[in-house]
């Protein structure tokens, strides 16, 4: 078994053993529990090993990633955890990493924010055919989650995440652009997106919103920070957890998010694709992260005849209409709602993969949602 110290920048957190398959097998020593990732620490070594593995699995390429089987064959590894282990668990979403026991490495020497990184793994996901590449283990692409193909790229000194769509319609990149433009019209804090065409396929680009001084904390690690009371709703419990962690501005952020998700029929707002930003040095929460990862929306997985129907929703209720009922204040620009259908139409119309009927049906469905949203919000104030 290999031995590693999980680090937060240059602060040692815990010494562990890891299997050849890339998973944590045992906790050997705890150093600085106060600097652990949110929601992970317990002084029970066995439970801590389980929690660390849960955390570790959240930062490796998921089994659902398009093209993963080919990548594992190409790199001759049994699991994506091995790829992340080879890159020392480094990420562009936070400052945690694996330091081999006995190593003199520092965070300054290995982090991907200020050092170059390999593009080989990310590019391999997008190549139709490839001979086995020379394996450079240092890449943040080994620590990116989500099922769509993606890669980190640097353009003019700025680090971007590039993400593809799913065949045959490749709609998700266009959805990201449309959702960002809708959020802009509603004055909702969001990550900006732009579209590029690479090898005749659309990709959406968004700049990294995390820096060397911050970390992204997914809502997934916040929601269980307290035990849930039988009297608490899922939404109420989540707010209570955020209050316990002293995260500012949560209620308003969630209400804005629910308005956007209702408008664009976001069917994939799981606890991993929204969350909060924490100061990596003081470990104090700074507030909500800008909204991102809105691509699985606008009925992108529905037939033309199904566009406009209500799809299963998450995370607080099972439909967008029920989630909208959680909104108690109008915290968006209500005058911007009227423009949203046209914003969506103009964006999706640029795709050569979406027929005119589909674009029309989607924009009309957004128009119906816009009228419903405006009517609901106008009654609140």
Which sequence ranges carry the predicted segments?
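Phosphate/dinucleotide-binding and metal-coordinating scaffold of catalytic cores
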Residues: 1-259, 263-264, 277-381
